[in-house]
Amino acid sequence: ELLPSALDLVDGETRRALAVGGPDGAALLIGVDGIPEQVDWQCAEVERILRPQGLVDARVLDGDARDAAWRARGALGRGAFAETAAVMKWVVLPAQVADVMEQGAAAAQRAGLPAALAAHAGVGVVEAVLAGGGVTAAVATVLTEWRALVRAAGGQALVESAPLAVKERVPVWDDPGPALRIMQRIKSQLDPAGLLNPGRFVGGI
């Protein structure tokens, strides 16, 4: 039975940051675990399934190369570029991951800002990183466009890191919708005087 331990879709910029080799363009990183025989079978099965779907290059990373690639994937927000302007997390349905990544890359390209996009494709969580060097207005514009396209897909977007000047233009938290009223009531019960970090949480709570 094919049971991948990881299923990450990465764009070309992320692929270069991970130094996994292969042709330019997007890549699907698939983690498999088990005894050597299980791992070999799963790798062969993955290739058998994906070849008819357009797979053009398949390679197995093991040992230090594998560990380095997954470490770099985990540190993408800090390591994709020499300088990072902002990191945003998107949450969408898994079936929409590829589309929103493509739209997000196009938005960054229009603004002239390099971007690295990577997703835990099986659960619909996308990490979007903007390279530093851009002016505040351009960074804020891209983050705003990203949030709009994620919302259009029925998802939510969170600004994980950005300079204060950008956060003053783009809310860190997305609109929580009707749930905000419930959270406000809970907050008022737990902190009636409004002393605990007022305005720091979603919806200005």
Predicted regions and their residues:
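Acidic, glycine-rich loop-and-beta core segments that form the ion-binding/anion-interacting portion
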Residues: 1-57
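Conserved glycine-rich FAD pyrophosphate-binding loop
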Residues: 10-12, 21-23, 47-205
